[in-house]
Curated annotation (Swiss-Prot):
GO BP, sorted A to Z: detection of temperature stimulus involved in sensory perception; modulation of chemical synaptic transmission; synaptic transmission, glutamatergic; thermosensory behavior
Subcellular compartments: Cell projection, Cilium membrane
Protein name, as recorded: Ionotropic receptor 21a
Protein task: Integral part of a neural sensory system in the antenna that provides the neural basis for the response to environmental changes in temperature (thermosensation). Specifically, required for thermosensing by the cooling cell. Plays a role in heat seeking and heat-stimulated blood feeding behavior.
Keyword Magnesium: no
Organism encoding this protein: Anopheles gambiae
A single MF term (Gene Ontology): transmitter-gated monoatomic ion channel activity involved in regulation of postsynaptic membrane potential
UniProt record similarity statement: Belongs to the glutamate-gated ion channel (TC 1.A.10.1) family.
Tissue expression from the record: In both female and male antenna, expressed specifically in 3 sensory neurons of flagellomere 13 segment (at protein level).
Length: 975
C-alpha cells in the first residue's frame, strides 16, 4: 500500500516536471526570434496602421529602423551598445519523442499564419480580376492605376497580377495629390476604347483621378470600409461613372487564421427618384474562386426604367420648322407661349418613353442667333438639353455633346422664278434649240445638192444672191407644199433621177419632222411648261446674282474656308442681313440685278408655304428654293459635356427612326402648321375626295394660241421693217442723185453767171430770144417789186414775150431794176399761149398751197410736179399718167422730161447779144447786174419764151435745155 502511494507520488512529480520541461521546450522565446531572423527580419510584425478608416496589417520597414537608429541619443545608443548580445541556444537534441512532436513546416505555418492568409487573399483577388478581364474588358485595352500606398504595402499583389495578366495593358501611378504622373494615358489615340482597373486607398477620389466615364468599364478596388463604399455609390461623384464595378473585402469579426475572406461586388442604380439620386446595389460575392450568384452581369445596363420623373431644363429658341414659338393671350391679357415643331413633338414622345419631365426656357443672348445662343448656355451648364434646329458642326461637337441626327437639313438658295413659261413660247416647245438649228441648216443646205443635181454646176449660184433666194423658196415651197412652182427651171419639172431622189428624201424628212412637231404641240399648248430654275451653284454662278445670308448663327463663317472654286468665286462678295425676313424681302424687291439668299432649306420652305404662299397666287413669279443642297447638315439636340442622359436619348432617337415615327411627326408638323395658297390651314380629306380627278376636256383659248398670232405679227413687223429699209434706201439714193445734180447745176450756173456778167458789161442789154409766131405782139403784164404792173415788151423783132421770174434774193423797194420794162413798152399780142406759162400757174395756186410750198414738205409731198400746165404731187402725177395711158404711152419720167423740155426752151437760135454761139441753146440767160458794184445778194433772172407752135413742131436746130427750177425755199418744183 505504501509502495503504491510512493509510486504515485513519484509519477506525479515526474509528470509535473516533464510537462514543465516540455512546455518550455515547445514554446521557447528565442526560438521564435530565430525563425524571424531566418526570414531576414529583426522583429515581429505585430503592429497595425490606420489608413482610410480601415485597419490592416502593416509591414516592417528596415529603412525606418535604420533612420531611428541613426537619430538615437548618445545615452540610448550607449545603453544599447552596453546591453548584452543575444545568445543563440542550440537546439537540444533529444532522441526521445515526448507526446506528439511537430515538424518544422508545421511550426513555420503556425508562426507565419498571417503571411499565408494575406497570400491567399491576394491570389483570390488576382483570380477574380483575371476572370473579369477575360469576360468584360478584353475588347478594350485596360489601364491599371495604383496609388503610392498600394505600391508600398501590396507590392506582392501587384507583382502577382502583372505576372499573370491575360491581355495587353497599360500601367499608371497615382501621385500623392491623386493626379496621374502621366495624364496622357487617359486620352486614347485612335478608335480604340479604354477600360480602367484602379487600386485606390480613398474611394471618394475616384472621379478626381479618371473624371466622368460614360462608356468605359471601370473596376475599382479601394482600401476603404464597406460603409465608405456605399456612401460613394450613393453620392453625386459616382453619377457620371456609369459602368462602375466596386470590389470590396468583407471584414468579419471571428477571423480564423486559415480562412479566406470573401470579396463583395457592388454597383449603383442611377436616377431612382425625381431628384436624380443613386442607390448602391450588391451584385454578388467572390469566395473560393467562384461567385456566390452565378450568371450575374457585373456591368448591368443602367437607366432601363428611364429617369423616374426627373425634371430637365431645356433651352429652346424659335427655329422653324424644328422649334416654332407661338404667342397667344387669354381673356385677361396674359401672354401664353406655346411651342410647336418637330423637335418639340420629339421631346414629348421621348419624355413619355424615358419617364422624365422638362421645363422650357429661352436663352438670353438672342443676338447670337437661335443655334449659337442655345449652344452657349448649354456649354456653360445652364441647361440639360438644347433644342433649336441646331446643325452638327465640329466646333459645336468640341464644345458640347450632341445627339445623333434626328433630321437632315441643308443650306439652299432662295431665288425669284417664273411660275410657268408664257404660252406664246409653246410653238417652240416641241423642239429644243439644237433641233431648230439643225432643221434650218438642213433646209438651207438643201439648195446646193438640189441645184447641183439639176444643173450639174453651181456657177449660176455663185455671187448671185437673188438666185440663191429663189432656190430657198423653191426648197421651202416644195417640201411644205405651201407654194407651187411650175416654171421652166423648177425642180418639180426635172427629169433627172438624182434630183427626184433628193426631193423624195427631203420630202420624207419633212413629213417626219412635221409629224413629230404636230404630235407634241398640243401638249405644250394645253399644259404649262415650267421654266428653268436655279437648283445648283453652277446655274447661280452663270447668272448675275447678288448673294446674301445671315450675319449670325454661324452662317457668316461656315463658307469662308471652302475649297470649292465656284463657291469661293460666288461668295467672294457675300452680303449679310440681320433676319430671314429681310433676306426674303431683298429677293422679292430686287431691281435690275437678281438677288439670291442662302439659308436653311427647311426654314425657307416653311416660311414660303405658311406665310407667303397666298401672296404669289395667280402671279407669274414666285419664290423658289433650290432642290440641290449647297451644304448638308445634320440636326441634333445639344447636351452638356459628359451628360448621363445622352446615351438613353440617342437610343430612343434611333428606335424612333427605325420605326418611322420621326417621318410621321415631320408630316404632322407640315400638315398642321403650313397653309394652303388661300391662306387657310390644310384640312384632312377622306373617302372619294382623296382620289385624283381626271382633267376635263376644254377648248383652246386665245391665250393658248397667242403664239401663232404673235408669230404672224412678227412676220408682219419684219416685213414692214424691210419695207421701211428699202424705202429709206431708195430715198437715200434719190437724195444723193439730187445733191449731185444740184452741185452740177450750181457749177454750171456759176459759169453762166460769169459769162453773162462779161456779156452785160460789154453790151449793157439783155439777150433777146428768138421770135415765135405765138407770142408775137402779145404783151404780158407783171407786177414789179414796187407793186406796179409792168408789161414785158417783145424783142427787137417783136417775136417773143420776155418774162422774168426772180428766184433768189430779195430786191429792196427803192432799188431800181434795170431789167424792168416800162409799161408803154409792151406790145399787144394777137394770140394767147396754148399752154400756161409757169408764172401764170403760180399765180393761180392758192395761198395755202404757196405757204406749203414755201415751208417745205412737212405734211404733204416732197416733190411737186408741173404736168399739163398744173402743179401736183408726184403721186397725183402717177395716178394721172395711169389714167391717161392712151395719151401717154411712156413712163412718168419721160412725160415729165417732155413737159419740161417744152417749157424751158429758148426761142432764139442764136442771140446777137450773146458772148458765145452756144449760149443760145441754154435753158435761160443768166445775167449779173452791177458789174462794178459789190453785191450782197445774187439775183438770177430766167427768161421764159412760151412758144405758140404745136407740141412737136420744133426746129431741128432748136436746143432743148432741161433745168430744175428751185426757189429760195429749196423746193424741187420740176425734175
Amino acid at each position: 500500500m505504501f509502495k503504491r502511494i510512493v509510486l504515485a507520488v513519484i509519477n506525479l512529480v515526474f509528470l509535473i516536471v516533464s510537462t514543465t520541461a516540455f512546455a518550455s521546450l515547445h514554446y521557447p522565446e528565442s526560438f521564435n526570434q530565430q525563425l524571424i531572423r531566418y526570414k531576414g527580419r529583426d522583429s515581429s510584425n505585430g503592429y497595425f496602421e490606420l489608413a482610410s478608416e480601415a485597419y490592416y496589417t502593416g509591414t516592417y520597414d528596415l529603412v525606418e529602423e535604420l533612420n531611428e537608429t541613426a537619430t538615437c541619443l548618445r545615452a540610448d545608443c550607449r545603453e544599447q551598445s552596453n546591453s548584452s548580445p543575444v545568445v543563440r541556444d542550440r537546439r537540444r537534441v533529444d532522441p526521445t519523442f515526448y507526446g506528439h512532436p511537430k515538424t518544422r513546416e508545421q511550426i513555420w505555418e503556425r508562426n507565419f499564419a498571417h503571411v499565408i492568409e494575406d497570400n491567399r487573399q491576394t491570389l483570390s483577388l488576382v483570380t477574380l480580376l483575371n476572370k473579369i478581364i477575360l469576360k468584360y474588358l478584353h475588347s478594350c485595352i485596360p489601364i491599371v492605376l495604383f496609388d503610392t500606398y498600394v505600391a508600398t504595402t501590396e507590392n506582392y499583389m501587384l507583382e502577382a497580377l502583372f505576372s499573370d495578366f491575360p491581355i495587353t495593358y497599360i500601367t499608371g501611378r497615382i501621385g500623392p495629390n491623386y493626379t496621374l504622373d502621366n495624364p496622357g494615358i487617359l486620352e486614347p489615340t485612335g478608335p480604340q476604347c479604354r477600360s480602367y482597373i484602379i487600386f485606390l486607398a480613398d474611394v471618394m477620389m475616384t472621379r478626381k483621378v479618371i473624371g466622368p466615364q460614360m462608356n468605359s468599364y471601370v473596376v475599382l478596388i479601394p482600401r476603404s470600409s464597406q460603409w465608405k463604399l456605399q456612401e460613394f455609390l450613393a453620392a453625386k461623384q459616382s453619377r457620371d461613372i456609369i459602368n462602375l464595378l466596386v470590389i470590396g473585402e468583407s471584414y468579419s469579426v471571428d477571423k480564423r487564421i486559415n480562412n479566406e475572406q470573401p470579396y463583395v461586388l457592388y454597383t449603383h442604380e442611377l436616377y431612382i427618384d425625381g431628384l436624380g439620386a443613386n442607390r448602391p446595389q450588391v451584385l454578388t460575392s467572390w469566395i473560393g474562386n467562384k461567385f456566390s450568384r452565378n450568371n450575374v452581369n457585373l456591368f448591368p445596363r443602367k437607366l432601363r426604367k428611364g429617369f423616374s420623373g426627373h425634371r430637365f431644363t431645356v433651352k429652346a429658341a424659335h427655329q422653324p420648322p424644328f422649334m416654332i414659338k407661338r404667342l397667344s393671350t387669354d381673356g385677361v391679357g396674359n401672354v401664353n407661349i406655346r411651342w410647336e415643331g418637330l423637335e418639340m413633338r420629339l421631346l414629348r414622345v421621348m419624355a413619355q418613353y424615358l419617364n422624365f419631365t422638362y421645363d422650357i426656357i429661352e436663352p438670353g443672348r438672342t443676338e447670337l442667333g437661335p443655334g449659337d445662343a442655345v449652344v452657349e448656355e448649354i456649354k456653360r451648364g445652364q441647361g440639360d438639353m438644347g433644342l433649336a434646329g441646331i446643325y452638327v458642326t465640329i466646333e459645336r461637337n468640341l464644345a458640347t455633346e450632341m445627339s445623333v441626327s434626328h433630321s437632315t437639313d441643308c443650306a439652299a438658295f432662295l431665288t425669284l422664278m417664273s411660275s410657268a413659261l408664257p404660252r406664246y413660247r409653246a410653238i417652240l416647245g416641241p423642239f429644243q434649240w439644237p433641233v431648230w438649228v439643225a432643221v434650218i441648216l438642213i433646209y438651207l443646205l438643201a439648195i446646193f445638192p438640189l441645184a447641183f443635181s439639176d444643173k450639174m454646176t453651181l456657177r449660176h449660184l455663185l455671187g448671185n444672191w437673188s438666185e440663191i433666194e429663189n432656190m430657198f423658196w423653191y426648197v421651202f415651197g416644195t417640201f411644205t407644199n405651201s407654194l407651187t412652182f411650175q416654171g421652166e427651171n423648177s425642180w418639180s419639172n426635172t427629169r433627172k433621177t438624182s434630183t427626184r431622189m433628193l426631193i423624195g428624201i427631203y420630202w420624207v424628212f419633212t413629213i417626219i419632222i412635221t409629224a413629230c412637231y404636230t404630235g407634241s404641240i398640243i401638249a405644250f399648248i394645253t399644259l404649262p411648261v415650267e421654266p428653268e430654275r436655279i437648283d445648283g451653284i453652277e446655274q447661280l454662278s452663270r447668272g448675275f446674282f447678288r448673294v446674301g445670308t445671315l450675319d449670325r448663327g454661324g452662317w457668316e463663317r461656315w463658307f469662308l474656308n471652302s475649297s470649292h472654286k465656284q463657291t469661293n468665286k460666288l461668295l467672294k462678295d457675300l452680303r449679310f442681313v440681320s433676319s430671314v425676313d429681310e433676306g426674303i424681302r431683298n429677293v422679292t424687291e430686287a431691281f435690275l440685278i437678281s438677288y439670291a439668299f442662302i439659308g436653311s432649306k427647311g426654314e425657307l420652305e416653311f416660311l414660303i408655304k405658311s406665310n407667303l404662299s397666298h401672296q404669289f397666287e395667280n402671279k407669274r413669279y414666285g419664290l423658289h428654293v433650290s432642290r440641290e443642297c449647297f451644304a448638308l447638315y445634320g440636326v441634333s439636340m445639344v447636351f452638356p459635356p459628359n451628360s448621363v442622359h445622352r446615351d438613353p436619348i440617342n437610343n430612343a432617337i434611333l428606335y424612333m427612326q427605325e420605326a418611322g415615327l420621326i417621318g410621321k411627326l415631320n408630316r404632322d408638323v407640315t400638315w398642321e402648321t403650313m397653309k394652303t395658297k388661300d391662306g387657310r390651314r390644310k384640312e384632312a380629306s377622306v373617302g372619294e375626295v382623296l382620289r385624283s380627278t381626271a382633267p376635263s376636256e376644254r377648248g383652246l383659248t386665245l391665250a393658248d394660241t397667242e403664239g401663232m398670232f404673235l408669230l404672224m405679227l412678227f412676220g408682219y413687223v419684219v416685213a414692214l421693217g424691210v419695207l421701211i429699209s428699202e424705202w429709206v434706201g431708195g430715198c437715200t439714193n434719190k437724195c444723193r442723185e439730187v445733191l449731185k445734180e444740184r452741185a452740177e447745176r450750181l457749177k454750171a450756173a456759176a459759169a453762166e453767171i460769169a459769162a453773162a456778167a462779161t456779156a452785160g458789161s460789154d453790151n449793157g442789154s439783155l439777150p433777146v430770144s428768138s421770135p415765135t409766131s405765138t407770142n408775137r405782139n402779145s404783151p404780158h403784164k407783171r407786177t414789179g417789186p414796187n407793186g406796179v404792173e409792168n408789161s414785158l415788151p417783145a424783142s427787137g423783132n417783136g417775136s417773143a414775150t420776155v418774162r422774168r421770174i426772180r428766184l433768189t434774193g430779195e430786191d429792196s423797194e427803192n432799188e431800181p431794176n434795170e431789167y424792168d420794162v416800162p409799161p408803154d413798152a409792151a406790145s399787144d399780142g394777137g394770140s394767147s399761149l396754148q399752154r400756161h406759162s409757169l408764172s401764170e400757174c403760180l399765180s393761180e395756186v392758192s395761198a395755202h398751197t404757196m405757204q406749203d410750198l414755201y415751208n417745205g414738205p412737212d405734211r404733204r409731198h416732197s416733190t411737186i410736179v408741173f404736168l399739163d400746165g398744173q402743179l401736183m404731187s408726184e403721186e397725183e402725177a402717177q395716178r394721172k399718167v395711169a389714167r391717161s395711158k392712151s395719151r401717154h404711152r411712156h413712163s412718168l419720167s419721160s412725160v415729165l422730161e417732155r413737159e419740161v423740155s417744152q417749157l424751158f426752151r429758148f426761142l432764139g437760135k442764136e442771140s446777137p447779144h450773146s458772148a458765145r454761139a452756144d449760149e443760145s441753146s441754154d435753158a435761160g440767160g443768166l445775167v449779173r447786174r452791177g458789174a462794178g458794184r459789190e453785191r450782197k445778194e445774187m439775183k438770177v433772172a430766167v427768161e421764159i419764151n412760151a412758144r405758140a407752135t404745136e407740141e412737136g413742131q420744133q426746129g431741128p436746130g432748136a436746143a432743148v435745155g432741161r433745168r430744175s427750177i428751185e426757189a429760195t425755199f429749196g423746193e424741187k418744183l420740176l425734175h
